[in-house]
UniProtKB/Swiss-Prot annotation:
Species of provenance: Escherichia fergusonii (strain ATCC 35469 / DSM 13698 / CCUG 18766 / IAM 14443 / JCM 21226 / LMG 7866 / NBRC 102419 / NCTC 12128 / CDC 0568-73)
Name of the featured protein: UPF0434 protein YcaR
PANTHER family registered for this protein in UniProt: PROTEIN PREY, MITOCHONDRIAL, ZGC:162634
A Pfam cross-reference name: Trm112p
Xref: InterPro entries: Trm112-like
One GO cellular component term: cytosol
Family as reported in the entry's similarity comment: Belongs to the UPF0434 family.
Amino acid sequence: MDHRLLEIIACPVCNGKLWYNQEKQELICKLDKLAFPLRDGIPVLLETEARVLTSEESQS
């Protein structure tokens, strides 16, 4: 994931900052507690494709 891209893109729900989880290949919105998948290195920034973070994940 190109870190320059992270400076440009935002959460499609709240327009907040996204954080990259390299282990899970996801972009995380801590405000909405959503994880957006990366498929073949491409962020899928659709709310319908996002998963809700567990309470443990949202606290870290």
